[in-house]
Every structure is written in structure tokens, then in C-alpha cells.
Amino acid sequence: MRFVFTAVRFTGFLFWCAAAVLTVLGLLSHFSKTRPWARWARRLLLALLAAGFAFFAVLEVWVISWARTDEETPVEAVVVLGAGVNGTQPSLSLWTRLEAALDYLQDRPDLPVVVTGSQGRGEDISEARCMYDWLTSRGVPPERVILEERADDTEQNVRYSKALLSGMGIGEDSSVAIVTSGYHLCRASRLWGEGAVPVAARMPARYFPISINYYIREAFAMAEAIVFR
């Protein structure tokens, strides 16, 4: 339910932003008949909107291009990025990541697995602990699964997981499988660096409209990461 609520809230935000822009354009169109400054302001706003849409389109293509699983590249470890936990059970988003991780691990029985994510509000256990319990209950040997329970966001997921792997002799130049939602892979892989090997978790078909919402939201997150980081 949290996944659906977040998607609906973001859609509402986009709706109000679009309504505000259309209102301003309407006012400028009205005043442009008698006031030259309004004509120039309207042209400037339209130019900015066109540039913004073009930038968004490029980012969206970039995000979509990473939503795939690379089965061919050999890796030295697997990192599963956390998502919400409902009490002690994985949320829909986290469940899809765990399913993708389990499927990827089937043919790679010797790889270490880092599960990363702290305990958030409304969660009875950490995201890492939830993933550990889920994977080990489905046959993954406990000694293969390394918990990282401090990370609160994607940047920390990457930083703390790299530190754990470094302690195991897996360095910056090593190839590591990054398991996360398809829409999230572009940003996560960009933060990880050249060694990132994508493993995409996909939503069930009935959640396709919500998935579109999340792909749109991720393009804005990528823009923020590029501009402010």
C-alpha cells in the first residue's frame, strides 16, 4: 500500500505543477494582447518548458536503457538494495528485488551477497534483516549473506556496501551485480561506478501504471543528482 500511496502522491504533485504552469500561460496569453512584457514572458516560459521537456526526455531514455539484466558479465559479488518493509515482511518493491536476486543467484552459488538498508519508520526490522531472512528461508546459505544495516538512501547503500566488499578483498575495479528496481538501476549504477552490472527487478504486469509513475519520478531524481551532486 505504501508503494501505491507514494505513486499517487507524486502523480498529484505533477498534476498541480501542470495546472500552475497552464494557469500562468493562460494569464500571460491574456495580457500579451496589450502588454509587450507579457508576450516576452510567455515566449521565455515556452522556451524553458521546451528545454525542460527535452532534458527530461534524454534522462528518461537513460533511465530506461539501464532497466535490464546483464547475465553475461562475470561478477565477484552481488549487492541487493533495500526498499520498504511492512512490519517484518518485504514491500512489493522489495519483494521484486528479492525475487530478482534469488533468480540471479541460482546459477551463481559461490557469490557473496550484500543486503543493504537500515530500519525505517513503521518497520519492525531493518531492510537488510528482512532481505536476509527472506533469502535464507529460500535456500541461500546464511554464510553467503552479509548484512549492511546503516544505509538510509541509495548513496549510503553504495558507500557502505563498497566498504564491506573492500574488507573482503573485492576492490573498486571489481564487477559487482547491483540488484534493484528497473527504474532505480540507472542512478544506483551511476553512483556505484564502472564496475556496476545491472540486475533489474520488474513489477508484475498489473502494476504497470504505477511502474510508469516511478520511471517518471526517477528522471526527476536523476536531474537532482546531476545538478546538485
Stretches with model-predicted labels:
Residues 12, 33-36, 58:
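Acidic, low-complexity intrinsically disordered regions
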